[in-house]
């Protein structure tokens, strides 16, 4: 079985080969990729050992009233360079333990280095003050001999190239330490006690046995370790760098292993276009610089991975999440949960005990009652809820959170009232702290805190997810008795140097508040942070809060908010300027609609549908509402009215099938109705316990299990699918099949994509009849645009009214795709959805529709299918069809 892993551990091994690299930090969590971390707190001496070399740092000269101290620039670490935005310096130390800046006299740090082999070595150090103080030049001594003088120190440089640097060469004898001292040389004519000045020094990082930075290329693009490198339409990646001062030519080396690079070009330009970059590969590259005399200087090895959409419909800033692509497959075979001793086959085991990139598939359907909060701590995980049989998977009891580069699709979270046990957690699904992650087609309800949270995240997307019926007066332990807290979501995003966060085509129904609560936070400098893109969302029957909160830059575009009987707050967006930070908070508002109780529609109107409020002494000296967007959305944006119909036609966990709760949410939003009343609040639609609605007993989620012969090789793809597609059903080949022609989708990803759309399986000459109305629920009176009969290579399909009929005269190795386009007769709005048809001769296990003996292939037998692509019995004379105990009426 192929495993195409891409991990930072592997990167570290590659980048550290042949050189020791030490990143000096004041926290273990801020080490640059490819470096060994050295955490230094407050002490007169500190030591570390890396790759057999031991380094001890001490204060040079007098130690009285002085101390080593690790320090960091928070904004620099988060936004710019972890390597040079923290380090160790020398500070004063008074009797009370305070550590003031030193502003008089020379200051030095001595490094005693042991373990070096006999011969010539080099040592490069970065000198960048993270505290915002300007320091004097420094000299470097080896064994007491001056080697380099007049090294400039930088102040909060944002890149390694702009940072102060020193470089020395020296001879070492095995068994004897080398002593290197860095000592400042303050200008006697300058008063360092005035302003932000210091006579001290900083060391951020140490790199042994690499060429002088003046002779090597730097500042690579893509950035080193970039796992989402930009790719052109022709799959090319442009490599560029800052040339060394001495360089006249650049030798470009590229490969897919760090120790197997090949020279691909010699150029005088500081760029190279790498053609046909494959997103399944990790690329390593190096630039060797050649000077005017023909001398070449070997550069560092950098690495990147070309980006690719998480799945074909992924949009927004989280669209390039990697997920489990290239990793293993884990099968959930049990609905049990055990916090203390997770068992193989359970979901918790696959999240906490299995490691490395992985795709989690489900061989069971039903309800997983989580006994406690569950958080995925690993990157590169795909949760493929669409693989479950029956009506899919639902979680209850405790929250679940994903990690960076996670892909989460087609799962339900219905938490339920806590009954006094609040320790398990009160929220629903989350992407808190995530970077490059996407959550798609999920359903969340009956939470006690917010249904969804993404605080401190960046580069994320939440799309086509249904958040509904957050329990309103449900005894939240952080609020007084009787307090309403039915919150939909707190959305952080685009923080800590991130580009943005996307929240689009979601349905928020029957939630008292936080529809959304925008949580931009503050950056490391205390300035307002966050970049939020909120578009094409639908909200119905909120209570006292619609969208509020704050962000540095927010886009609120083409959303549709429909007033319900419990709605009291008419403003759709309240930009709350609360005086908690510096800088600005601004918004681009365009194309939104508020549908009022009487059916009238209000367009964007300042101080009506949107407004700002001031508090906390906030001084307003900027324009809050701007006339142009701040950043691109990387998505197709519909009008608000189009979005209303589009979202209601395709939202929530609708694969393998919507449950009756989500069907009710869609219908009540569509028709402006409610069917519940809160037992505490007495508010229509805003429930306080799940028993005010269906309750768990009223949900139509049922247990189901795949047959034993479903997936012989356990690669996530059933045998019938592999036999149809021509892949190997006896050997795991889920990571194969990625080509430029199919968008570099693996075999497994192609199967997951099939399951993510309305899909149907049949034998050749079996006629498939599909009632299209459930797939276009937001279009109450639609017509098919491309009507009539179509035929292509033995595949025939036709429309009659709202019915699609399809048939194939022989089996096909690839599913056939029908793009069904419909038009609303009243609004004129259109939508297109993909329907997949798999026509196969492969044996089909139980659970897949097969023709009966009374319906031979050659007669063109006919079958009616439900939303799961499961065949139902034929309709009777009254148009009534029975399937799995449910009634379907053809009108």
Give the ranges of each region predicted by the language model.
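Compositionally biased, intrinsically disordered or flexible polar/acidic segments
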Residues: 19-213
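N-terminal extracellular ligand-recognition/capping segment immediately after the signal peptide
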Residues: 125, 336-349, 356-382, 388-395
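Surface-exposed or secretory-pathway low-complexity segments enriched in glycine-proline
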Residues: 256, 765-805, 833-835
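Extracellular fibronectin type III
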Residues: 290-308, 830-831
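Right-handed parallel beta-helix
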Residues: 307, 367-495
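Acidic Gly/Asp/Thr-rich repetitive segments characteristic of extracellular carbohydrate-active
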Residues: 311-360, 866-873
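All-beta strand scaffolds that present successive hydrophobic residues in beta-strands
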Residues: 360, 383-384, 395, 406-410, ...
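Extracellular calcium-associated, cysteine-rich motifs in secreted modular proteins
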Residues: 689-761
């Amino acid at each position: 079985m192929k495993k195409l892993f891409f991990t930072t551990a592997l990167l570290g091994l590659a980048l550290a080969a042949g050189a020791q690299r030490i990143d000096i930090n004041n926290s273990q969590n801020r080490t640059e990729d490819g470096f060994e971390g050295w955490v230094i707190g407050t002490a007169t001496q500190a030591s570390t050992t890396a790759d057999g070399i031991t380094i001890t740092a001490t204060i040079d000269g007098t130690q009285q009233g002085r101390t080593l101290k690790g320090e960091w620039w928070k904004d620099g670490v988060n936004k710019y360079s972890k390597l040079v935005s923290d380090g160790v310096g020398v500070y004063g130390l008074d009797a009370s333990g305070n550590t003031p800046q030193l502003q008089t006299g020379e200051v030095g740090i001595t490094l005693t280095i042991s373990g070096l082999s006999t011969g010539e070595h080099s040592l490069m150090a970065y000198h960048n003050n993270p505290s915002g103080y300007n320091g004097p030049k420094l000299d470097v001594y080896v064994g007491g001999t001056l080697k380099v003088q007049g090294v400039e120190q930088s102040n909060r440089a944002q890149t390694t190239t702009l940072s102060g640097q020193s470089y020395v060469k020296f001879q070492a004898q095995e068994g004897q330490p080398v002593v290197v001292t860095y000592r400042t040389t303050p200008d006697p004519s300058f008063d360092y006690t005035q302003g932000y000045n210091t006579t001290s020094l900083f060391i951020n990082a140490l790199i042994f046995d690499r060429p002088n930075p003046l002779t090597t290329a730097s500042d690579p693009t893509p950035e080193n370790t970039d796992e989402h490198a930009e790719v052109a339409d022709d799959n090319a990646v442009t490599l560029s760098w800052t040339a060394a001062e001495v360089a006249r030519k650049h030798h470009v080396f590229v490969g897919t292993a760090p120790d197997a690079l090949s020279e691909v070009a010699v150029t005088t330009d500081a760029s190279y276009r790498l053609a046909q970059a494959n997103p399944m590969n990790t690329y390593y590259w190096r630039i060797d610089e050649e000077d005017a005399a023909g001398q070449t200087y070997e550069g560092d090895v950098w690495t990147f991975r070309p980006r690719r959409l998480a799945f074909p419909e992924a949009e927004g800033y989280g669209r390039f999440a990697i997920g489990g692509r290239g990793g293993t497959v884990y099968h959930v075979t049990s609905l049990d949960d055990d916090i203390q001793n997770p068992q193989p086959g359970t979901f918790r085991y696959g999240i906490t005990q299995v490691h490395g990139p992985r795709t989690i598939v489900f061989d069971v359907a039903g309800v997983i009652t989580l006994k406690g909060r569950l958080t995925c701590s690993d990157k590169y995980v795909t949760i493929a809820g669409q693989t479950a049989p029956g009506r899919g998977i639902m979680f209850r009891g405790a929250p679940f959170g994903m990690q960076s580069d996670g892909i989460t699709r087609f799962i339900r979270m219905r938490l339920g009232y806590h009954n006094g046990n609040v320790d398990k957690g009160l929220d629903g699904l989350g992407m808190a702290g995530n970077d490059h992650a996407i959550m798609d087609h999920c359903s969340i309800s009956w939470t006690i805190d917010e249904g969804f949270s993404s605080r401190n995240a960046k580069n994320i997307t939440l799309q086509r997810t249904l958040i509904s019926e957050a329990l309103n007066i449900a005894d939240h332990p952080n609020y007084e008795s009787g307090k309403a807290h039915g919150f939909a979501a707190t959305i952080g995003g685009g923080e800590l140097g991130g580009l943005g966060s996307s929240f689009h085509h979601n349905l928020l129904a029957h939630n008292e508040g936080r529809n959304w609560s925008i949580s931009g936070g503050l950056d490391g400098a205390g300035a307002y942070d966050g970049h939020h893109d909120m578009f094409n969302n639908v909200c119905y029957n909120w209570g006292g809060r619609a969208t509020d909160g704050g962000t540095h830059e927010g886009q609120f575009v083409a959303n549709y908010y429909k007033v319900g009987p419990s709605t009291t707050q008419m403003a759709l967006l309240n930009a709350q300027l609360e005086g908690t930070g510096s800088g600005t908070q601004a918004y681009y508002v365009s194309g939104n609609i508020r549908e009022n109780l009487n059916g009238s529609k209000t367009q964007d109107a300042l101080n009506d549908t949107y407004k700002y409020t001031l508090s906390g002494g906030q001084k307003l000296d900027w324009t809050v509402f701007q006339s142009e967007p701040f950043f691109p959305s990387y998505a197709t944006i519909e009008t608000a009215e189009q979005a209303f119909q589009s979202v209601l036609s395709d939202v929530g966990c609708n694969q393998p099938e919507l449950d009756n709760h989500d069907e009710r949410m869609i219908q009540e939003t569509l028709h402006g109705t409610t069917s519940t009343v809160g037992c505490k609040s007495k508010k229509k639609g805003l429930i306080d316990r799940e028993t005010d609605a269906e309750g768990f007993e009223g949900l139509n989620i049922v247990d189901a299990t795949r047959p034993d012969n479903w997936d012989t090789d356990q690669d996530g793809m059933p045998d019938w699918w592999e036999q149809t597609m021509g892949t190997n059903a006896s050997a795991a080949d889920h990571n194969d099949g990625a080509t430029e022609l199919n968008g570099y989708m693996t075999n497994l990803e192609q199967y997951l994509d099939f399951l993510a759309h309305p899909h149907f399986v049949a034998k050749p000459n079996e006629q498939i009849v599909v009632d299209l109305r459930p797939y276009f629920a937001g279009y109450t009176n639609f017509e098919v645009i491309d009507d009539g009969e179509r035929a292509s290579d033995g595949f025939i399909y036709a429309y009659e009214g709202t019915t699609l009929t399809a048939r194939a005269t022989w089996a096909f190795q690839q599913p056939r795709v029908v793009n069904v386009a419909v038009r609303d007769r009243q609004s004129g709005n259109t939508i297109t959805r993909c329907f997949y048809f798999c026509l196969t001769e492969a044996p089909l296990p139980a659970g897949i529709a097969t023709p009966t003996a009374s319906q031979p292939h050659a007669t063109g037998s006919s079958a009616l299918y439900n939303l799961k692509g499961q065949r139902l019995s034929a309709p009777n004379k009254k148009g009534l069809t029975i399937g799995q105990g449910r009634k379907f009426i053809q009108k």
